[in-house]
Structures are given as structure tokens and as C-alpha cells.
Amino acid sequence: MTDGEFRLAYVPGVTPGKWAGVWAERVREVPLRLLQIPATEVVPLLRNGGVDAAFVRLPVDREALHVIPLYLETTVVVVPKDHAVAAAEEVELADLADEDVFEPLDEVLTWDDRPGKPAFTRPESTAGAIELVASGAGVLLLPQSLARLHHRKDLTYRTVTDAPQSQIGLAWLEAVTTDLMEELIGIVRGRTPNSSRGRNPQQQPTRKKPPKQRPASKHRPQKRRRR
């Protein structure tokens, strides 16, 4: 943390707005600064102290880092709207065997056996690969979040059911697990403000219930007879 703010990096495709909103409600005294950082740069930036925590795409080098895996992303294939794949609701890798598949230099998926045929070039970025797909030169496989980020009206995408998936995680330095970091972990994991693992939950003192009072007797006292 620096200058009274908590710096949270995130890789393209991650949408931290919901968590940022919860932070603003719970940690009003410390602003949350969001920084979108390329996937290849985010871990070095974290190690150098440029940010306090980061949403990263796994796997990453975990040396000196704490990493919490959060969720898996659906993998899709991006194609022109008039492509044959667009007629299906979802496809398998075998359906792409005859396709020219782009592999950008900032590829985020890990492949044992890449489908299709290598395209004629390796674009420097996912954005560049999207441009080439729009020209009809090939197709591109990537997480659905990135397909949405690079949305174009002339392109569409379909789920690839048996493709490897990208996983998003929350990372921070092992040596810097602060109260604010614990607060962020709680927010991301959906803990309530008064969770026992929260930063400083305010506990209300237990109030003892007052003793129950017996209802007054309905019988009137009998008058003493005069002798």
C-alpha cells in the first residue's frame, strides 16, 4: 500500500468491479486503485512492489507468493459470423482440425496438443490475432472473457467443450499479508463483514435477557370479616 491506497492489478478479461464495490462499502478509509496489467507483466510488477495484490492467470511462478485459485474460464473459438462453426451451439477440438489457428505471443492457454494447423504468422498480441480472424485468415481460441473484451460486430464465438481452460487466481507476496490483504481475501471469497476472519469485525456485546415477570394474580384479595 502506498499514499493511503491499496493497489490491485488485474489481467485483461477479469472484471473486478463487483469486488471493488464491496471494498468501497467496507474499507472507506482506504481507496482501492485498480490497474489493468498485461498477463506477462503482472507477476514481475507484484514482486517489485508495484502493486499490493493481483488477479492473475494461472499457472504462475509461485516463489515467494501466496496464490488462491478462484475460478475457471470457459474456452471459446472466435470466428467470422459467416464461418461454418457459427452454425453450431458448441464445438469440439476435432471440429477445428482443418482450421488455421492463430497463436499470439501473449497466449494464455496451455496446450499439450494444439488443434488445427498453425496459422501463417504469430501475432504479437491477442488484439492483433482478432484483427486477422476478422480478415478471414484463421480462427483463435481463448478464454471467453477475452473474447468479450475484444468483441467485434463481424465476429462471434462458440464454446469449445474439450479445450483446456484458463484459471484466475488472487496473488500477493508471502511477506506482506496485511490486514487490508485479509480484507480483500474475505471480499473475494464472499465472507460477510462480521466473519471471524475479517479484518476487525465489530462484535456486539451479548445482552442478557431480563428475567421473566410473573403475571399479576387476577384474584382480588379477600376482605377480612369483622368479628
Where are these regions (language model features)?
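Short alpha-helix C-terminal cap/hinge motif
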Residues: 2-8, 12-36, 44
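Short, well-ordered beta-strand segments
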Residues: 5-11, 54, 78, 102, ...
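Secondary-structure junction motif
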Residues: 17, 89-122
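A late-sequence structural motif
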Residues: 18, 158-208
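Short beta-strand-centered segments that line the small-molecule binding cleft or hinge
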Residues: 22, 40-75, 155-158
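Short helices/loops that flank or line small-molecule/ion binding pockets
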Residues: 24-25, 35, 39-51, 126-137
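A ligand-binding cleft/hinge motif common to bilobed small-molecule-binding domains
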Residues: 55-65, 126-155
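Flexible hinge/capping segments at coil-to-helix
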Residues: 67-75, 79-101
